[in-house]
Amino acid sequence: MKSESKIDWTVPRPNKNPKTKQPYKRGRNWGIVVYPESLPENWKDIIRQEPIAVSPLHDKDVNPDGEKKKSHYHLVLNYKGNKSFEQIDEIARSLRAPAPQRISSLTGAVRYLTHMDNPEKYQYDNADIETFGGFDLESCLALSTGDKRQALRDMLAFISENEIMHLKDFADYCMSEEAPAGWFELLTERNTLFIKEYIKSNWQKQQYASKNINKMSD
C-alpha cells in the first residue's frame, strides 16, 4: 500500500474483489478495516449517521508466526437496502481506510468484532463495541433459534460427511477460522454431550459395518 502522504483519498478506487478479481455486486452488508494513525480526528462524526458497528481497538492480535499485528478497528455496515461498492468506498476513503469488502455473513462479521467464535484469538469485550445509526447489535450477536437449529443440522452433516471419529477433532475444527460462525458456541454451551454421542454412534456404526464386511469375506 502506498504511504498515506501519497494517497489521494478523493480518487474513487476500482471495484474489484481481491479474492475473485471480479467486481462486487450491490449488497446490504459491508466491512471496512481502519487504522488509528490514519483516521481523521472527527472519524466518528463522519460515520455517526451510518448503520455501523465498530469493534474495540484490536491491539492484541498476532500473526500465525507470533508477530503482533498493526492495531486496527473493524467496522461492519448493515443497511436496509443494497449499496454499491462505490457508495461504501466513499465512506472508506473519508476514513482514509483500505477498500471496503462485501460481508457474506452479518452475524459472523459482528461476532468477529470481539472474536466470539475464535477462542484461539484474543477475546475482546462485547461491551466495548460501539454502534451508530440504529445498528441492531443484539440481534446480530445472538444466533436465532432457527439459526441454531440449522447450524446444528450443518454440524451433524459435517461430522458424517467427513467421518469425524473423535470429539477433539471436531472441537479443533470449530475453533478454527474455517468453521462457520456460532459452531464453537453451540458445541461448548449446550450440545457437547449430544454431539459426543452422535460422533460415538457414527464410530460404532462404522465398526459394525466393517465387521459385517469381514464376515462376508471369510
Swiss-Prot record:
InterPro entries: Plasmid_rep_OBD, RepB_C. The keyword Lyase does not apply. One of its GO terms (cellular component) is extrachromosomal circular DNA. One of its GO terms (biological process) is DNA replication. Residues 1-26 are annotated as: Disordered. Keywords: DNA replication, Plasmid. One of its GO terms (molecular function) is DNA topoisomerase activity. Residues 16-26 have a biased composition (Basic residues). It comes from the Bacteria. Belongs to the Gram-positive plasmids replication protein type 2 family. Is essential for plasmid replication. Nicks the positive strand at the plus origin of replication. This is Replication protein RepB. It comes from Lactiplantibacillus plantarum.
